Amino acid sequence: WYKIGEGSESVLESRWYEGEPIWVTAEKQGKVSATYFWPGSEAEINGKRPTYWYVFDASTSNETIIDQLLAWLDLPEGERPVFMTAYFNDANYWGHTLGPEAEGMDTVIQGLDLDLGRLIAGLTARDLLDKVNIIVTADHGMVEIDRDRMIFLDDYIDLEDVTMAGWSPVAGIIPNEGLEDSIYNSLVNVHPQLSVYKKEETPEHLHYRNHRRITPIIGIADEGWSISTRDYYNSNPEAYIGGTHGYDPDFLSMHGIFLAYGPAFKDGLIVPSF
């Protein structure tokens, strides 16, 4: 199975990555690229890696990351990256831990704003601010969850009859041989906050039908609801508190920011969500 996160061995396996990351495109063109934490950047993809890259370490400070970005820009031409990525974990970690509406999240966002200011100041000092293109974005939103909004699959099916490839808020369900219709019929329409689909019937806007790794049955919780088992729920009193993501992307809570600045972008332009 693939599992993202610190210490995961699967993130090093190129077989999981079928798209072409931008840094691979750059390297194919003979350009220098650099990544400071980004999904896929620890693996060799299509025979390529970034010129400079780091193994994910959640304890790395944002100041360390930003200072390395600036140090890369100080390298001589030919060694200096023309494409760089950096990932900051604060909003995700604390969003999961506290929940996105928690008072402490204001402090987290203020800290990230200061970190961005550190980068801008470094670019300004190097007379690069108006010569580089900067994109600030997020991979997902976040919504509050709590232990009162639960869907227990074992109320409806025998978990010995399935393999679970994911739990919440999207349950990836692989029925044992010959049981697909039975499992589907046992789950569809049994809970008002759970939508259940066969792979080929998922909503078009999810773009989640055709890949071979998509499970035969998919259960999707409504916004703010969680999918679990009663045993796991009862054994883990700290679970399902705080925030999470992965719900239908039509929910505004799942939207992320996308800000861009630099010579390649129109000043003041606002575009529709995408």
Describe the role of every protein-language-model region.
Residues 1-100:
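His/Asp/Glu-rich, glycine-adjacent segments
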Residues 28-34, 78-84, 128-133, 192-195, ...:
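Loop/turn elements at helix/coil->beta-strand transitions in domains of secreted/extracellular proteins
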Residues 83-87, 135, 259:
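Structural motif
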Residues 165-274:
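Active-site neighborhoods of enzymes that stabilize oxyanions during catalysis
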